[in-house]
């Protein structure tokens, strides 16, 4: 038999060791002018031209064939990193890597000028996974709990998301974390009888608490708090 069984505990380790020699060392010996990043079996090669990209793609396919491997044709593509002063027409101008989508985005420089930048932000797939994780939180058992107890339970997860996805274009992650505040609003409406039919009042109550305890939840400390009441 060939290969490592899917789901094997040692599978990722063996695959990583194999690719270290099949790909990493081969690239350094034969194509040291092309930088690359590899995480498990996901790899990016940085090329200076379409000609170079097509050349290295052919070389990698040949190398893999020699080692009884093949590329995933659906995921393998040449991407044009379009940004200011790079306006050559090309069909593929974005890609996903390790939970991020890299694509052209409008940015503002230190002088307030708008320019086109090729940069990462949390991918749609990663946003969906976070949303699903939040939806799967069993908030029913939160009802007898205080906010401090809920914070202790979910803060490690939220902080992990912020640490990983919040470094680039954090606005998009903040939109996803709105669902955390929504779950807290649901908790408040279930816990306090006077708020069960008053969603806006519950939001304001949480917003007022966030002003008093801005570091209670990881995303509040990050600056994404519920809206406080007008008196605040």
Provide a role label for each language-model segment.
Residues 1-232:
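Non-catalytic terminal/accessory segments
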